[in-house]
């Protein structure tokens, strides 16, 4: 994992975590608008770093690296953090571990659905079956995604797929916030307007 830093020292901090298959460059237009007023930390997720080879191992590993960086470089505190898609899932794990203080967290299109318990198993099997069939029947996903990342994804699918004996991992829909984080919906624009 790599971090790109923009903006001035001492300004309110803003962490940006991109989604699957993209680098921090997806945020460059936003960074251009906000770097005069914020200290922006843009994450390059393992497996999608530009210019260096890295391997994506797990969402928990990515969250641990974000936490370590925030503790070391930001004193364990952020004013705002934004996670897009997979970045939102990583950010949810950072929040779940409760090791750093984040005043405002925005999880955009993160795979966090409030589902009834009885629906967790069937949905997990359904998702794994989709990935499994796409991989084995067309090979499409292996061409789209970094091959090592896809191998990790398939390993997770094998744990819950019927042939894997149903060894489900605690991920995705099963228990997103085991430490009881309360989510408060706020107007995110008020944060940016007050800070601008």
What role is predicted for each listed range?
Residues 117, 133-185:
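Conserved alpha/beta-hydrolase catalytic His-Asp/Glu region
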Residues 83-91:
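Gly/Ala-rich beta-loop-alpha elbow adjacent to hydrolase catalytic centers
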Residues 185-189, 193-196:
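Short beta-strand/loop motif that positions the catalytic acidic residue
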Residues 96, 102-132:
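Flexible "cap/lid" loop of the alpha/beta hydrolase fold
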Residues 13, 39, 78-80, 102-104:
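Structural signature of beta-strand start/N-cap positions in the alpha/beta core
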Residues 4-52:
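Conserved HGGG/HGGXW glycine-rich cap/lid loop of the alpha/beta-hydrolase fold
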């Amino acid at each position: 994992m790599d971090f790109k830093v923009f903006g001035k020292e001492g300004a309110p901090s803003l962490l940006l975590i991109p989604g699957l298959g993209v680098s921090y460059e997806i945020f460059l237009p936003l960074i251009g608008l906000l770097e005069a007023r914020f200290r922006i930390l843009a994450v390059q997720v393992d497996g999608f770093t530009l210019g260096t080879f890295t391997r994506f191992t797990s969402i928990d590993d990515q969250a641990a690296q974000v936490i370590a960086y925030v503790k070391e470089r930001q004193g364990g505190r952020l004013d705002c953090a934004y996670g897009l898609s997979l970045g939102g899932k990583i950010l949810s794990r950072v929040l779940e571990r409760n090791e750093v203080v984040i005043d405002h967290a925005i999880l955009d299109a993160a795979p966090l659905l409030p589902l009834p318990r009885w629906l967790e198993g069937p949905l997990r099997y359904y998702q794994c079956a989709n990935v499994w069939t796409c991989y084995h029947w067309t090979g499409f996903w292996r061409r789209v995604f970094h091959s090592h990342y896809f191998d990790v994804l398939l390993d997770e699918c094998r744990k819950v797929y019927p042939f894997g004996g149903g060894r489900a991992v605690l991920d995705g829909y099963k228990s997103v916030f085991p430490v009881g984080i309360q989510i408060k919906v706020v107007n995110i624009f008020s944060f940016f307007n007050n800070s601008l």
